[in-house]
Amino acid sequence: LVGGCVRDLLLGLRPKDFDVATNALPEEVKRLFRNCRLIGRRFRLAHVFFGAEIIEVATFRAASAPALGEEPLADLDPEEGEGPEISEPEEFDADIADTEGEDSHVLDMHGRILRDNAYGTIDDDVWRRDFTANALYYNIADFSVWDDVDGADDGRARGLKMIGDPETRFREDPVRMLRAARFAAKLDFTIDPPVEAAIHAFSGLLASAPPARLFDETLKLFLAGHGAKSFSSLRRLGLLE
């Protein structure tokens, strides 16, 4: 288990869903589970259907040399640990799609990730996630929590710290700024000063984010029981301008 569900359990909260990270490739996950489909080209994921629930399964990501690429795609981001996006991303059929020759890690001219399907190990994966409190892994084999970035301590202290350089991470995915505002509102987290400064400096990057992802994040901000706090957080961070 990975991400928000582990964070919430450590904080004594009830997770709304559970996400899985694995070294199995998406195509391997699909072969294991009958009720499974692969989605997304920007971030290829497996959705395993268990009754009315959807279990999101992401393969460990790794850093790779980026290539400059094409127009942005509006798929969901596996770093989130927040369950499937509300709007339906493009379904990907691994049995018929031809992805041979495609770059696995593509950035646009502003540093935004357009495609990220470079797979690696759990040690690689942790550094691809956004905030330290979301980079927690629960190993069901020995019931241990893997924490390489002091995310548990940051979560208990209600501090929202970014993994890596905030400017670089926001350029990779501007929607992370909205996620920071949401976590501050939802969990009463205090945003780390360097992170907050970067949000004020680079809020204009949100104009380049895919509309579908902005829509999904807006729904999470205002329709999850903390709408007033979300509005205050967005206004304080200059994200409504």
Language-model regions: role of each:
Residues L1-E241:
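Catalytic cores of the polymerase beta-like nucleotidyltransferase superfamily
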